[in-house]
């Protein structure tokens, strides 16, 4: 059937979200004697994780208009996070001068991330406006920000090492976590409702509130591809369009959803001073020999403008930069490129075990708090060693991160993919325990995963995803067309040291391995439980079409899914897992979605 289907967001909310919720509520409770206001409230709250809290929050709102109810819920969530932030500050004050360096560091970090959460919630409320008909294709971006708001709160708790303090803060911020969780559920219901009607968010016309019927084009096929090749550089790419993993990857290896201007930057920023530095004009140049504007990377970051609509381009010339680099939240759209991942190296030694006043989040050699970060031909290293325990090489908290041809070297917690949507291609990442971990939607393609030798008696786990809410949040790690191999120092003991593809850090941990070569360094069981927890019973672990001695699945744990068809992993392709791409459409840049 050809033709337009015109329907507003509010209509979807009211007809599908609210109506289905009310029917479900009435069927369950047998009570049809509800006021219009309570019908709307019960309908909206039916899909939330904590219905009682949701209803209690919305009961005082004297309206049955979904626009006003959902807006009121967001404002209540913002108020709750303000209270959580105040509670954290008060707790730090109550500890007085006797507070330990680690507790002070983590509480200061908590105050910072609560500030980030409040900023994002204020943006959400502003973007929502007074009429939900106007949010159109913003729905998924709002949901992405809400996911970040939730993650900021869990970041605070995850970084607290002391049990008593974690319990105190956990109880103090419980209300804001519940409200944020419910807010995510409400937005998830909206998106799911549109899916039930076979409508797509990106089809919304913001000015009219209407949408077109969805395209009938099929999903891009998943190709087996070829394994990457390890050398002194990051992993070599397969040649030619016939070997593209997805229709969303062009002949340069860059996703088509990256804007035209950024694609040019990625293409021009080649390895070596005779290639990259000469081909694009950097905003700032960093050089240890004084030939640039700055001698440290942090100085260049500090010089970049805040809330930049364009790109701040930093060329880091060859050299080892022994510094910790922090990119604040307002320093968005920074693009760093070096002269080679082994030539331009940012290195630092900071760890939870050996550095007083350090948390996992604060241990990162490079810490990216901002959106739109890009990097190419740079090495990121934490030199704390296995005795340092958690020691992050890079932590990326910002949405829309794109990283190519880089190295990440460390031991425990090397690559912290902690928030937003992140895409990595042709990287090398090495480590021991949970060395690719976080709470983001991340795809790593055509990369070399190197399992290292840690402390005596220590096991290795490649991944540790932190999804706490399941399908309502798009959080999970995807490794596609990668190679998983032992480091040279581990090779002789690779069959003795226990190494696994991952373990579930949180209740709904999500990790997918697709079209990858898995060496015999990985044990036949494949995956490990998180000691003391039952997260393996609810996690979502999937393997599809892998190869190599470590990919044999007949002895796998019984809680991993072995997919037999491409359709079973289609949700985890770049197009689906890192989309929708409305954030590029809103920026009015060229984008190719399909063929």
Curated annotation (Swiss-Prot):
GO terms of biological process kind: cell wall modification; pectin catabolic process; pollen tube growth
Key words, A-Z: Aspartyl esterase, Cell membrane, Cell wall, Cell wall biogenesis/degradation, Glycoprotein, Golgi apparatus, Hydrolase, Membrane, Secreted, Signal
Catalytic activity field: [(1->4)-alpha-D-galacturonosyl methyl ester](n) + n H2O = [(1->4)-alpha-D-galacturonosyl](n) + n methanol + n H(+)
Sequence motif RKLM cleavage motif, location on chain: 263-266
Active site residues according to the UniProt entry: 413 (proton donor), 434 (nucleophile)
Signal peptide range: 1-24
GO CC field: extracellular region; Golgi membrane; plasma membrane; pollen tube
Glycosylation sites (chain numbering): 86, 206, 349
Keyword Membrane assigned: yes
Known pathway: Glycan metabolism; pectin degradation; 2-dehydro-3-deoxy-D-gluconate from pectin: step 1/5
Residues annotated as binding substrate: 360, 390, 503, 505
NCBIfam families the UniProt entry points to: PME_inhib
Free-text note on domains in this protein's UniProt record: The PMEI region may act as an autoinhibitory domain and prevent untimely PME activity during transport. The PMEI region is cleaved by SBT6.1 (S1P) in the Golgi apparatus prior to cell wall targeting.
Protein name, as recorded: Pectinesterase 5
Organism: Arabidopsis thaliana (Mouse-ear cress)
Gene behind the chain: PME5
């Amino acid at each position: 059937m050809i033709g337009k289907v015109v329907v507003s967001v509010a209509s979807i909310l009211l007809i599908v979200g609210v109506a289905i919720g009310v029917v479900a509520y009435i069927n369950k409770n047998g009570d049809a004697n509800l006021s219009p206001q309570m019908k709307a409230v019960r309908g909206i709250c039916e899909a939330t994780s904590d219905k009682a809290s949701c209803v209690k929050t919305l009961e005082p709102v004297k309206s049955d208009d979904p626009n006003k109810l959902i807006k009121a819920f967001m404002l209540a969530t913002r108020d709750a996070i303000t209270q959580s932030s105040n509670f954290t500050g008060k707790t730090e004050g109550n500890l007085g001068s006797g507070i330990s360096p680690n507790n002070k560091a983590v509480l200061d970090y908590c105050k910072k991330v609560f500030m980030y959460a409040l900023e994002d919630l204020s943006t959400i409320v502003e973007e929502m406006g007074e009429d939900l008909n106007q949010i159109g294709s913003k729905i998924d971006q709002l949901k992405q920000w809400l996911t970040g708001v939730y993650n900021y709160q869990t970041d605070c708790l995850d970084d607290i090492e002391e049990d008593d303090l974690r319990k105190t803060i956990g109880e103090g911020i419980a209300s804001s976590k519940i409200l944020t969780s419910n807010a995510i559920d409400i937005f998830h219901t909206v998106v799911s409702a549109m899916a039930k009607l076979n409508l797509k968010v990106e089809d919304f016309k913001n000015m009219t509130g209407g949408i077109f019927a969805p395209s009938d084009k099929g999903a891009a096929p998943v190709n087996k591809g070829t394994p990457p090749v390890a050398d002194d550089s990051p992993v070599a790419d397969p040649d030619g369009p016939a070997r593209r993993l997805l229709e969303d990857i062009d002949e340069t290896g860059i996703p088509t959803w990256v804007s035209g201007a950024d694609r040019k930057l990625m293409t021009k920023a080649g390895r070596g001073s005779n290639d990259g530095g000469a081909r694009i004009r950097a905003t700032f140049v960093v050089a240890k020999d004084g030939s640039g504007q700055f001698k440290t990377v942090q100085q260049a970051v500090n010089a970049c403008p805040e809330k930049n609509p364009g790109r701040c381009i930093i060329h880091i010339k060859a050299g080892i930069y022994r510094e910790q680099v922090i990119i604040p939240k307002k320093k968005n759209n920074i693009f760093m490129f070096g002269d080679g991942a082994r030539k331009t190296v940012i290195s630092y030694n900071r760890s939870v075990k050996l550095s007083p006043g350090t948390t996992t989040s604060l241990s990162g050699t490079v810490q990216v708090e901002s959106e739109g970060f890009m990097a190419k031909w740079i090495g990121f290293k934490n030199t704390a060693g296995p005795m340092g325990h958690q020691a992050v090489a890079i932590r990326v908290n910002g949405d829309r991160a794109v990283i190519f041809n880089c190295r990440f070297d460390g031991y425990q917690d090397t690559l912290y993919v902690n928030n937003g949507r992140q895409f990595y291609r042709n990287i090398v990442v090495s480590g021991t325990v949970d060395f690719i971990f976080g709470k983001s939607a991340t795809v790593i393609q055509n990369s070399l995963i190197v399992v290292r030798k840690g402390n005596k008696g220590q096991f290795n786990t490649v991944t540790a995803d932190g999804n706490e809410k399941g399908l309502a949040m798009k959080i999970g790690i995807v490794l596609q067309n990668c190679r998983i191999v032992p480091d040279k120092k581990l090779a002789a003991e690779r069959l003795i040291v226990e190494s696994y593809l991952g373990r579930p850090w949180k209740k709904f941990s999500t990790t997918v391995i697709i079209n990858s070569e898995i060496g015999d360094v990985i044990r036949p069981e494949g995956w490990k439980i998180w000691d003391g927890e039952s997260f393996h019973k609810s996690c979502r672990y999937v393997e599809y079409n892998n190869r190599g001695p470590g990919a044999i699945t007949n002895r796998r744990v019984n809680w991993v899914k072995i997919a037999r068809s491409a359709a079973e992993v289609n949700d985890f392709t770049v197009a689906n897992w890192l989309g929708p791409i409305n954030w590029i459409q809103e920026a009015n840049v060229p984008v190719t979605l399909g063929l």
